[in-house]
Amino acid sequence: MKKLLKQSLLGFALVSMTGAAFADAQSVAELQRRLEQVSQYSADFDQTVRSSKGKQIQSGKGKFQVKRPNLFRMDTKSPQENLIVSDGANLWFYDSFVSQVTVNTVQDAVNNTPFVLLTSSDKSHWDQYDVTQNADTFVLKPKSKKSNLKQFDVRIDQSGMLKGFSTIERDGQSNLYVLRNITGGGVSSDLFKFSVPKGAELDDQRGGKKSKK
């Protein structure tokens, strides 16, 4: 009797795991289908940063531009200028306030920078996240316990119109981005080429080197 009960519980666990994996695969496929419907667009964004207790600690504005596959640019204009650019192979982050550029490979950066997924169909990128769907909201959670990210939410309708996205860090701080003035087409590939500004310090995480232009 005990053996039969043990086998039944094991079978139930396996069925539950298989069902969860199937649901996750369905959610990934649906999110990718929606993202792929719009190949390029440009939008303004409003950013709201909240503490782990829900208190607003900062707000910002900027421009978000995407060109599939694998290209995106997030240009924050206020309250402090900074720039994130994916050129398809590398992810560049420029902090103008401290005049520093950090660069990493997209493959290594995707675990902490899920924005990459908005333009990527690379299975190795998506395999780093568990994905669930609730209507037009998709919740992505990194599988790695080493990630600084706890959760990434994407709000996108069935026509592929991205409404916004948000991140929740391990410490509970959240960043909400709401898109507006969305326009499709006419996004130049030159926007996704990055050159280190003169005088800026370069922190090259691809090889762990630091240099100054």
From Swiss-Prot:
Q: How does it assemble?
A: Monomer.
Q: Which residues form the signal peptide?
A: 1-23
GO biological process terms held by the UniProt record: lipoprotein localization to outer membrane; lipoprotein transport
- Name the predominant localization: periplasm
What NCBIfam families has UniProt attached to this entry? lolA
User: One Pfam family this chain carries?
Assistant: LolA
Keywords annotated in UniProt: Chaperone, Periplasm, Protein transport, Signal, Transport
Q: Where in the cell is it found?
A: Periplasm
Q: Which domain of life is it from?
A: Bacteria
Q: Which family does it belong to?
A: Belongs to the LolA family.
Recorded protein name is Outer-membrane lipoprotein carrier protein
InterPro entries linked: LolA/LolB/LppX (IPR029046), OM_lipoprot_carrier_LolA-like (IPR004564), OM_lipoprot_carrier_LolA_Pbac (IPR018323)
Originating organism = Actinobacillus pleuropneumoniae serotype 3 (strain JL03)
Gene expressing this chain = lolA
Explain the purpose of this protein.
Participates in the translocation of lipoproteins from the inner membrane to the outer membrane. Only forms a complex with a lipoprotein if the residue after the N-terminal Cys is not an aspartate (The Asp acts as a targeting signal to indicate that the lipoprotein should stay in the inner membrane).
Return the HAMAP family for the record. LolA
Q: Name one GO cellular component term.
A: outer membrane-bounded periplasmic space
